[in-house]
Structures are given as structure tokens and as C-alpha cells.
């Protein structure tokens, strides 16, 4: 008997690593974008958790009045945040080695920049990883295009807006109440509710929720029954089956009669494209709106635009909103400036026309 031995060429360690990274047989696909994503998101997550729990107060306004954001300094889950870096730092890149000491780095809010920059690189890489996996599986690339909407939104509030305003202290705090504070101040300074791109974003988010609920309920209501009355209809579907699991003709007929004929889709592909495109385009517009308002191209101003025949102002909801904006602007950064710029820039209102005569 003859035994034939084939010599197996052992691949180098680097080649094995390359094959593992790009293999679509792994339980979770890594990919080249994933290598960088794992490193940056781990760094951002670890720094965020440590800073949220134990970071000392940060001099966010650059006026030597630190703001506490961590749990160990009296906050809870709702009020806690990683406080943005100091206004004294501005737009300067502020890694640990740029500070004279670790205490100075913490006092000036260095962890905020560390978390934000690594987080943004991480989500960019996640988007690239979606494209990479689609490419290797022979799929079309639209999944990463859809994900670009939240990526654009995060980039707008964490990077574009601080650049436009001239300081990372104007970036969105990394916490729940800090996010709400950011929203209030953004409304006060930029009147975002009156910006058409924000309106398109609201239509995209709420409309997407409505269309998703409508689609899910129509499909669930028009399933092709494959089970008995005593079994769940969900058991009638087998993963990978070729047959349609619901009757699109029935769903089309129902919705066409409920609204009108042309409000209903008769093409499943165009329907699902619409379901994906509506919220994505809306969030794109909101991100674009925040990016333009970053450079103070603000929402519409219809203040005092309705006058009576005598020239007196008839207040509209725009005037009510303007009053709320001024109130919010007075409240924020109350120690950094004594008066909102909108009010301080106006003409002085006389409180007395003539000095009162005393003792005639």
C-alpha cells in the first residue's frame, strides 16, 4: 500500500488574521472597518463610563465656575453627564498630553473630547463595516446609506455645531438632562422650531413611525393562513420559504378603499424603498439644518409681523415663541453674561421722560 503525504503550507500569522477579519463565516463579521471600530468604540465607552461615574466638575464656561456632571459629585442617572470641554479650550485639540497635569485635563473637560472623537470615528467605521459586509455578500449598498442619517445627526451636534460656534463647550453634553439643556439653548439661540429643515425632520421621524405602523399592521392583517385556528399564525412561516407570507393584493385593496386608490402601493419593492427613504431623508434635512444653524443661519423670524391700523403689534404664536426664547436665553449661562445679546443689542426703553420735581 502506498501512502501519499501532501505537505501543507502554513500561512503566515498576518495572512491568517486577514482571512479571519474578512471572513463572512464568523458569527459576527469584523471587517477592516470593524478593526478600527472596535478599538475606538471600546475607548469611547470605557472613558464615558468612568467619566460619568467619577469625573470632577468641569469649568465649561471658562469663568472658573465648574459644573459637576458625574454620579460621585451628587448627580443621578437623569441629571448626570460628561460635561463638554471648557470654553477656555475653544476648538483646540485637547488630548491628555496637551495638559500640564491630569487634574488640569479633567478640570477643562478633556474626557468629553476623548469620548466624542473616538465615538464619531467608531460610528463612521460602523457605517463602513455595513458597506463592507454588503459588498462581500454581493448585496446592494443601501443599508449603510440609511445608517448615514443618524451618523450625520451625531456629526452635526458633536462636531459641526461646535466648529460653527467656535468652541466645543457648545457641543451636546453626554447625558439625559444635558441633552435637553442643549435643545432648549439651541431653540433660544437659533429658533430651530421655525427652521424648515427641522420641520422636514419632524415629518420624517413621525411620518416614518406612522408608515411603519401602517405597514406592519397591514401585513399582519393580511397573512396567508397556513395553520389551524388553534395555532399561532406565526408558525405558518418557515424561514427561507419562497412563497409570499402575506397577500399584498388584499392589503392594497383594503388601504386603497380606506384612503383612495393611489395612496396604496401595488409594488412591494417601491413600498419598502419609500419606508426606508422617508425617515432617512427627513433626518438628513435636520442634520443639514443644524449644520447651517451652527453658522447662525437661523430659523424664520416672524416676530411682531402683524400690526393693526394704528401700528400696534398684534401678537402671534411667533411672538409667544420669541418670548419663550428670550426667557431660555436669560436662564442659560447666567454667570457668563448678564443679559441676552438679543435684548442688550436693542434700543434702550425710557422708563421716565423727565426727572420728577422734588419739593416744587
From Swiss-Prot:
EC supergroup of this enzyme: oxidoreductase
GO MF: chlorophyll binding; electron transporter, transferring electrons within the cyclic electron transport pathway of photosynthesis activity; iron ion binding; oxidoreductase activity, acting on diphenols and related substances as donors, oxygen as acceptor; oxygen evolving activity
Ligand binding (chlorophyll a PD1): 198
Cofactor note: The D1/D2 heterodimer binds P680, chlorophylls that are the primary electron donor of PSII, and subsequent electron acceptors. It shares a non-heme iron and each subunit binds pheophytin, quinone, additional chlorophylls, carotenoids and lipids. D1 provides most of the ligands for the Mn4-Ca-O5 cluster of the oxygen-evolving complex (OEC). There is also a Cl(-1) ion associated with D1 and D2, which is required for oxygen evolution. The PSII complex binds additional chlorophylls, carotenoids and specific lipids.
InterPro entries: D1/D2 (IPR055266), Photo_II_D1/D2_sf (IPR036854), Photo_RC_L/M (IPR000484), Photo_RC_L/M_CS (IPR055265), PSII_D1 (IPR005867)
Topology class, membrane: Multi-pass membrane protein
Record-listed Fe cation binding positions: 215, 272
Entry's Gene Ontology cellular component terms: photosystem II; plasma membrane-derived thylakoid membrane
Residues that, per the record, bind [CaMn4O5] cluster: 170, 189, 332-333, 342, 344
Residue positions binding chlorophyll a ChlzD1: 118
SUPFAM superfamilies the record matches: Bacterial photosystem II reaction centre, L and M subunits
Main location, first listed in the record: membrane
List of residues binding a quinone: 215, 264-265
Modification(s) after translation: Tyr-161 forms a radical intermediate that is referred to as redox-active TyrZ, YZ or Y-Z.
An example Gene Ontology biological process: photosynthetic electron transport in photosystem II
Site (Cleavage): 344-345
EC number annotated for this UniProt entry: 1.10.3.9
Family annotation (Pfam families): Photo_RC
Residue numbers marked as site, Stabilizes free radical intermediate: 190
Binding-site positions, pheophytin a: 126
Top-level taxon: Bacteria
Alphabetical list of NCBIfam families matching this protein: psbA (TIGR01151)
Protein name, entry field: Photosystem II protein D1 2
Species whose genome carries this gene: Synechococcus sp. (strain ATCC 27144 / PCC 6301 / SAUG 1402/1) (Anacystis nidulans)
Amino acid at each position: 500500500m502506498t501512502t501519499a503525504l501532501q505537505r501543507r503550507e502554513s500561512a503566515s500569522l498576518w495572512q491568517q488574521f486577514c482571512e479571519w477579519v474578512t471572513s463572512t463565516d464568523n458569527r459576527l463579521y469584523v471587517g477592516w472597518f470593524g478593526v478600527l471600530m472596535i478599538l475606538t468604540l471600546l475607548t469611547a465607552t470605557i472613558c464615558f463610563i468612568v467619566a460619568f461615574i467619577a469625573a470632577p466638575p468641569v469649568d465649561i464656561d471658562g469663568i472658573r465656575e465648574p459644573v459637576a456632571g458625574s454620579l460621585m459629585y451628587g448627580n443621578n442617572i437623569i441629571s448626570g453627564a460628561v460635561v463638554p470641554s471648557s470654553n477656555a479650550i475653544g476648538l483646540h485639540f485637547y488630548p491628555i498630553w496637551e495638559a500640564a497635569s491630569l487634574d488640569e485635563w479633567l478640570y477643562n473637560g478633556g474626557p468629553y473630547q476623548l469620548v466624542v472623537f473616538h465615538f464619531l470615528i467608531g460610528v463612521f467605521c460602523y457605517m463602513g463595516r455595513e458597506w463592507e459586509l454588503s459588498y462581500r455578500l454581493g448585496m446592494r449598498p443601501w443599508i449603510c446609506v440609511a445608517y448615514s442619517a443618524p451618523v450625520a445627526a451625531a456629526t452635526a451636534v458633536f462636531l459641526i455645531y461646535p466648529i460653527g460656534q467656535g468652541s466645543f463647550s457648545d457641543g451636546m453634553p453626554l447625558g439625559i438632562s444635558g441633552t435637553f439643556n442643549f435643545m432648549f439653548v439651541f431653540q433660544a439661540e437659533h429658533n430651530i422650531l421655525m427652521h424648515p429643515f427641522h420641520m422636514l425632520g419632524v415629518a420624517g421621524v413621525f411620518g416614518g413611525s406612522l408608515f411603519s405602523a401602517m405597514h406592519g399592521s397591514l401585513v399582519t392583517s393580511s397573512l396567508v393562513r397556513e395553520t389551524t385556528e388553534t395555532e399561532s399564525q406565526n408558525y405558518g412561516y418557515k424561514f427561507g420559504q419562497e412563497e409570499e407570507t402575506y397577500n399584498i393584493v388584499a392589503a392594497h385593496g383594503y388601504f386603497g378603499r380606506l384612503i383612495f386608490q393611489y395612496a396604496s402601493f401595488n409594488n412591494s419593492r417601491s413600498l419598502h424603498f419609500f419606508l426606508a427613504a422617508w425617515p432617512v431623508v427627513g433626518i438628513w434635512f435636520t442634520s443639514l439644518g443644524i449644520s447651517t444653524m451652527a453658522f447662525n443661519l437661523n430659523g424664520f423670524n416672524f416676530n411682531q409681523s402683524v400690526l393693526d391700523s394704528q401700528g400696534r403689534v398684534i401678537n402671534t404664536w411667533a411672538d409667544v415663541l420669541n418670548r419663550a426664547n428670550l426667557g431660555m436665553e436669560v436662564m442659560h449661562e447666567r454667570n457668563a453674561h448678564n443679559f441676552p445679546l438679543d435684548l442688550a443689542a436693542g434700543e434702550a426703553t425710557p422708563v421716565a421722560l423727565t426727572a420728577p420735581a422734588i419739593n416744587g
